Amino acid sequence: MATQRASGLLQRLAQGSLVKQILVGLVLGILLAWISKPVAEAVGLLGTLFVGALKAVAPVLVLMLVMASIANHQHGQKTNIRPILFLYLLGTFSAALAAVVFSFAFPSTLHLSSSAQDIVPPSGIVEVLRGLLMSMVSNPIDALLNANYIGILVWAVGLGFALRHGNETTKNLVNDMSNAVTFMVKLVIRFAPVGIFGLVSSTLATTGFSTLWGYAHLLVVLIGCMLLVALVVNPLLVFWKIRRNPYPLVFACLRESGVYAFFTRSSAANIPVNMALCEKLNLDRDTYSVSIPLGATINMAGAAITITVLTLAAVHTLGVPVDLPTALLLSVVASLCACGASGVAGGSLLLIPLACNMFGIPNDIAMQVVAVGFIIGVLQDSCETALNSSTDVLFTAAACQAEDERLANNALRS
């Protein structure tokens, strides 16, 4: 009898609402950090294991899904990569532009007194682009081990096209392997409430939020701009694409992708979550198996906002005059830098000196701005990743749904 009750409880947990379970894990994590910091730090291992499991399965998932979708692609079957790529680039530039407007409307200043950290940023935009190109020709084993998604995509696409000429048995094997990896991903995602419980409790216990109050205004501008993009700019782009109320789709993506990304703080770790959401939304697998890992690499609206806001905060602090053409140029530079953020250790923060260089700000001061970024990173990085990752699914869904409606309308006319 006790065994039956236990199995019934496990079944309810396995089939219950994952979002509700995550909220429970979030509340319990906050309570544990408030009650006992040592215990909260100890259970941080649960969060580390969860993020590690997601990061471990994500490269294999991308390789197998992309390879299987291309190998089994039927001649004449249309994918929607081009409109999604356009949305990614337009969304990133729009975010940078919104950050410029927000920064001028609510100018922030910094206390540039902390010593620059012993880290070396890229010397220019050419180096960032060079890094991206070099990652394309990475060894496939090395790409898998280091989660180099550009390299993984290149090899997956190449192998997929090569396997198109293979036997049907080989194609079926690749497809079965893809399904097996997808099953493993779903299994890992079911442990999200436990992982988020560990992440929240350890983060609050080790960092707290007392150090953030000194940068409250900067954080309000940063997070406010990200909310503006998530709730106004992105919905406008989606409405332009699907021509109907975008908010049900926007909120679904924020709830089921953004929440995970906020706590894991890793676009790579969130790839399996986004893939599962795309499947739930019944999107075209050939499309999302490519667009989601591609989005985790180049769709960086949050990074564009971070680079722009922190750069203009440094500009306002130093009293450097900025005209409209320069502000527009900053939006372009921030967008280009953001697209290369995934290929730089330290992400968007270490690309701030590139943008600061536009205004003649010395590198030692620019690195102090980076140091400020690390201080507020607990919230900045979480919000940035949540915006980046949820937008990957949002734009993929918008493009797929727009294409489905176009095909349906054409069928009705004929």
Swiss-Prot record:
Disulfide bonds: none
Family statement: Belongs to the dicarboxylate/amino acid:cation symporter (DAACS) (TC 2.A.23) family.
Biological processes, Gene Ontology terms: serine transport; threonine transport
Originating organism: Salmonella typhi
PANTHER family tied to this protein: PROTON/GLUTAMATE-ASPARTATE SYMPORTER, SERINE_THREONINE TRANSPORTER SSTT
Main function: Involved in the import of serine and threonine into the cell, with the concomitant import of sodium (symport system).
A cellular component term, taken from the record's GO annotations: plasma membrane
Name listed for the protein in its UniProt record: Serine/threonine transporter SstT
A family per Pfam: SDF
SUPFAM superfamilies: Proton glutamate symport protein
Residue ranges the record marks as coiled coil: none
HAMAP family in the cross-refs: Ser_Thr_transp_SstT
Compartment(s): Cell inner membrane
Catalytically driven reaction(s): L-serine(in) + Na(+)(in) = L-serine(out) + Na(+)(out); L-threonine(in) + Na(+)(in) = L-threonine(out) + Na(+)(out)
Gene3D superfamilies with a match to the protein in the record: Sodium:dicarboxylate symporter (1.10.3860.10)
Bilayer topology annotation: Multi-pass membrane protein
Gene Ontology MF: a single term: neutral L-amino acid:sodium symporter activity
